[in-house]
């Protein structure tokens, strides 16, 4: 079953591309027509691409891996933050830190520094510093929190990148390509889809367009997380059942040995009685 349909995308304005003079020829297969100098995207193909991307994202989430969402353009920031947070995925909506992926250990150090400062503020050590030091640390923490707060839980490289505007986030796309990390992206008619593993041809400027696509993709991620949770619960139940069965076996063996031991004296008492009955016959 399709996660979106033609009417939903049409209502959200997903079909509006850029001016003809700004187009990228690589997007030609996804352009339906030109109207008033603006390219119109073929939404039937968009529906198919959304389903492909959503299924892949679902499998990534089901395997317990992370998808990093990237959207630093104004109209996409709040939507991405909301949707990514809802499915417990990391995101970048401020300036993309250069080397975020290719120099990940350095980024992790900055995140740890931010965590250390937070602990200083919580355990009371912060109060023993001078006003100047407190001001410097507060500013440093605010800067780190703004740029890296949303990736604080990202302890290793993400398994995929989801980008809203591939032209604006070209550095993030290049870093992901360099490391072989799959890239999912909303690609408009002015962008190059060649470096994108799962491209979704659609309007990447309108809020409604961005939201309807993110809804479909994040719903798929949520489904993957639920399936993973259910599988782990089943595995836990099976493990507990197996452990109970293992514990039951020694008890059953002990019970059998106890029964055998209680029957043995009875057999020995019957044996002499049988000999006494046979003795007169022998004389």
What are these regions (language model features)?
Residues 13, 69, 161, 213:
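Residue-level signature of catalytic and energy-coupling elements of molecular machines
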Residues 70-73, 163-165:
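Short His-Asn-centered micro-motif
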Residues 1-66, 72-73, 77-120, 131-134, ...:
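N-terminal cationic and glycine-rich segments that engage phosphates or anionic surfaces
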Residues 75-76, 168, 205:
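Glycine-/small-residue-rich active-site loops that bind phosphorylated ligands and cofactors
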Residues 87, 92-194, 202:
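Long, charge-patterned amphipathic alpha-helical coiled-coil/hairpin "stalk" segments used as oligomerization
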Residues 241-246, 261-283:
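D/E-rich low-complexity acidic segments and tails
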Residues 254-262:
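Intrinsically disordered, low-complexity Ser/Pro/Thr-rich segments
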Residues 171-234:
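Short glycine/threonine-rich loop/turn motifs
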């Amino acid at each position: 079953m399709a996660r979106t349909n033609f009417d939903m995308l049409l209502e959200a304005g997903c079909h509006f591309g850029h001016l003809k003079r700004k187009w990228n020829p690589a997007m030609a297969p996804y352009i339906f027509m030109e109207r008033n100098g603006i390219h119109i995207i073929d939404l039937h193909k968009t529906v198919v691409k959304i389903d492909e991307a959503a299924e892949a994202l679902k499998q990534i989430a089901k395997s317990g891996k992370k998808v990093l969402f990237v959207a630093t353009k104004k109209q996409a920031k709040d939507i991405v933050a909301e949707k990514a947070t809802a499915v417990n995925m990391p995101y970048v909506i401020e300036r993309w830190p250069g080397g975020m992926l290719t120099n990940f250990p350095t980024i992790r150090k900055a995140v740890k520094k931010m965590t250390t400062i937070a602990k200083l503020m919580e355990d009371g050590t912060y109060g023993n510093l001078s006003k100047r030091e407190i001001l410097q640390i507060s500013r440093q923490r605010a800067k780190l929190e703004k740029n890296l707060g949303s990736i604080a839980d990202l302890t290793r490289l993400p398994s995929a990148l989801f980008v809203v505007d591939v032209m604006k986030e070209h550095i993030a796309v290049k870093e992901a390509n360099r490391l072989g990390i799959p890239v999912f992206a909303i690609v408009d008619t002015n962008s190059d889809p060649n470096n994108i593993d799962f491209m979704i041809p659609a309007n990447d400027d309108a809020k409604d367009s961005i939201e309807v696509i993110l809804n479909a993709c994040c719903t798929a991620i949520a489904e993957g997380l639920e399936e993973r949770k259910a599988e782990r619960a089943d595995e836990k139940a099976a493990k507990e059942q197996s452990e109970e069965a293992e514990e039951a076996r020694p008890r059953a063996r002990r019970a059998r040995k106890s029964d055998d031991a209680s029957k043995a004296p009875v057999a020995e008492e019957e044996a002499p009685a049988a000999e006494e009955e046979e003795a007169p016959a022998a004389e």
